[in-house]
Amino acid sequence: MEPAKMAPIKNAPRDALVMAQILKDMGITEYEPRVINQMLEFAFRYVTTILDDAKIYSSHAKKPTVDADDVRLAIQCRADQSFTSPPPRDFLLDIARQKNQTPLPLIKPYAGPRLPPDRYCLTAPNYRLKSLVKKGPNQGRLVPRLSAVSSRPTTPPVAPPQAVSGPNKAATPVSVTSQRFAVQIPPSQSTPAKPAPAATAVQNVLINPSMIGPKNILITTSMVSSQNTATDSNPLKRKHDDDDDNDTM
């Protein structure tokens, strides 16, 4: 450092000159000018703390003024806290010997950094986050939401029943109940005018309720059995066969 920085200023305060002289007497010749200010702040803080402690001790002993014994007691108590010397070497060796007798924890057998368990390291968090959101009774459950459109398949619209007029048999009106629909279909119009008394076959058709709704629909169809149709067509066939035989003769 330059000598101009180490030399105290002549017009400096008296406390600064005294601190510079103390540093010179201790053999400290190289320092920055700000060191004197730091030393003055430390000295002021230390002296005021010692005097405050001495005043407390004097009032506790019920003395009218602070004497030298109170100051010595304050310095002795403050020295144990502020100015501590390192422990002796023998004491440190004894503590190190006792500490080294404790075996180290086993290392986990896995790939990666060979570290002791997490409780002996500072790598794992030692806290747990608490959620502020309170879970309700129904939270976390999946509640199915069904719509009227997706719950049942679409069905084509049913045309209103109409009365069909036949040459032989009049169509019976359609009877509609609350839950069942009875529909009777008359025999086909292609049959000849000559009615043939034959037993009618009844066929019941039950539609799956899941396709239409909660109501069941029963459709009753009255139809002429296939045997009656066969008996009606057989005379015509026989007549044609007889005509063919006459022509050949």
From Swiss-Prot:
Residues 224-234 have a biased composition (Polar residues). One of its GO terms (cellular component) is transcription factor TFIID complex. One of its GO terms (molecular function) is protein heterodimerization activity. InterPro entries: Histone-fold, TFIID-31, TFIID_subunit_9. The keyword Acetylation applies. Signal peptide: none annotated. Disulfide bonds: none annotated. Residues 148-171, 224-249 are annotated as: Disordered. It comes from the Eukaryota. The keyword Nucleotide-binding does not apply. Binds TAF5 and TAF6. Component of TFIID and the TATA-binding protein-free TAF complex (TFTC). TFIID is composed of TATA binding protein (TBP) and a number of TBP-associated factors (TAFs). Binds N-terminal domain of p53/TP53 which is essential for transcription. Essential for cell viability. TAF9 and TAF9B are involved in transcriptional activation as well as repression of distinct but overlapping sets of genes. May have a role in gene regulation associated with apoptosis. TAFs are components of the transcription factor IID (TFIID) complex, the TBP-free TAFII complex (TFTC), the PCAF histone acetylase complex and the STAGA transcription coactivator-HAT complex. TFIID or TFTC are essential for the regulation of RNA polymerase II-mediated transcription. This is Transcription initiation factor TFIID subunit 9B.
